[in-house]
From Swiss-Prot:
The lineage of its organism: Bacteria, Bacillati, Cyanobacteriota, Cyanophyceae, Nostocales. The keyword Transmembrane does not apply. This is Circadian clock oscillator protein KaiA. The keyword Ribonucleoprotein does not apply. Signal peptide: none annotated. Belongs to the KaiA family. Transmembrane segments: none annotated. Keywords: Biological rhythms. One of its GO terms (biological process) is circadian rhythm. Homodimer. The KaiABC complex composition changes during the circadian cycle to control KaiC phosphorylation. Complexes KaiC(6), KaiA(2-4):KaiC(6), KaiB(6):KaiC(6) and KaiC(6):KaiB(6):KaiA(12) are among the most important forms, many form cooperatively. KaiA and CikA bind to the same region of the KaiB(fs) form and therefore compete. The gene is kaiA. It comes from Nostoc sp. (strain PCC 7120 / SAG 25.82 / UTEX 2576). Residues 1-102 form the KaiA C-terminal domain. Key component of the KaiABC oscillator complex, which constitutes the main circadian regulator in cyanobacteria. Complex composition changes during the circadian cycle to control KaiC phosphorylation. KaiA stimulates KaiC autophosphorylation, while KaiB sequesters KaiA, leading to KaiC autodephosphorylation. KaiA binding to the KaiC CII domain during the subjective day yields KaiA(2-4):KaiC(6) complexes which stimulate KaiC autophosphorylation. The KaiA C-terminal domain mediates interaction with KaiC, homodimerization, and is responsible for the clock oscillation function.
């Protein structure tokens, strides 16, 4: 049972980290690369499957969309955040590729 709890805690932390990446992705945040690297390292070391990352992304985008609608704003700009997901998955592929050739 504790392994399941640990997994849930890890997933919540990853979701929180990914939220920070999303919020700063289109800004000039100089720490963004470090945030992405930290996230990728955590995902890689924990052996989190790619569909889980996609699910985290979709959940957060859905939350953002609901918030924008509550504020009376459109959510068209959220489509741009697909780039964030593509970037994260590309970094993860590089981590896997690097691990294979070591």
């Amino acid at each position: 049972m504790t392994q399941e709890v640990d997994q849930q805690i890890l997933l919540q932390q990853l979701k929180s980290d990914y939220r920070q990446i999303l919020l700063s992705y289109f800004t000039t945040d100089k720490a963004l690369k470090e945030k992405i690297d930290k996230f990728i390292n955590a995902v890689f070391c924990a052996n989190i499957p790619v569909p889980e990352i996609i699910e985290i992304h979709m959940e957060l985008i859905d939350e953002f969309s609901k918030q924008l609608r509550l504020e009376g704003r459109g959510d068209e700009t959220l489509m741009d955040y697909r780039l964030t997901l593509i970037d994260i998955l590309a970094h993860l592929c590089e981590a896997y590729r690097g691990a294979i050739f070591k």
